[in-house]
Amino acid sequence: MEFKGILILLIISGTLSILILGASYILGYKQPDMEKVSVYECGFDPFDNPGNPFSVRFFLIGILFLIFDLEISFLFPWAVTYMGLPLFGYWVVMLFLFILTLGLIYEWIEGGLEWEN
């Protein structure tokens, strides 16, 4: 059993985690204060029925944000090494930006960026 050390580490860390969680539950301050019962920054009431559906617009805007955030993370290394890249590297990035621009134009035309619909 060559992984005995890892097994012992997992058992010790699991036991310690359970002990700390239990101590926090037993010794923790349980009286709600004004910050705990107030409405969050997003405007949702913490004691409201959690079964209320979210608008699909929230998810659409979130997905669009992720797509364009990833675009920036892909473009940063290219921008750092731009002068050392051959012409092929330039055209690959231009194709990438063109495809993303087409996607943005499509979303714009379909009304995905308008909140009022």
UniProtKB/Swiss-Prot annotation:
InterPro entries: NADH_UbQ/plastoQ_OxRdtase_su3 (IPR000440), NDAH_ubi_oxred_su3_sf (IPR038430). This is NADH-ubiquinone oxidoreductase chain 3. It comes from Sarcophyton glaucum (Toadstool umbrella leather coral). It catalyses: a ubiquinone + NADH + 5 H(+)(in) = a ubiquinol + NAD(+) + 4 H(+)(out). Core subunit of the mitochondrial membrane respiratory chain NADH dehydrogenase (Complex I) that is believed to belong to the minimal assembly required for catalysis. Complex I functions in the transfer of electrons from NADH to the respiratory chain. The immediate electron acceptor for the enzyme is believed to be ubiquinone. Pfam families: Oxidored_q4. It comes from the Eukaryota. GO terms for molecular function: NADH dehydrogenase (ubiquinone) activity. GO terms for cellular component: mitochondrial membrane; NADH dehydrogenase complex. The chain crosses the membrane at residues 6-26, 58-78, 85-105. Keywords: Electron transport, Membrane, Mitochondrion, NAD, Respiratory chain, Translocase, Transmembrane, Transmembrane helix, Transport, Ubiquinone. Gene3D superfamilies: NADH:ubiquinone/plastoquinone oxidoreductase, chain 3. Its main location: mitochondrion.
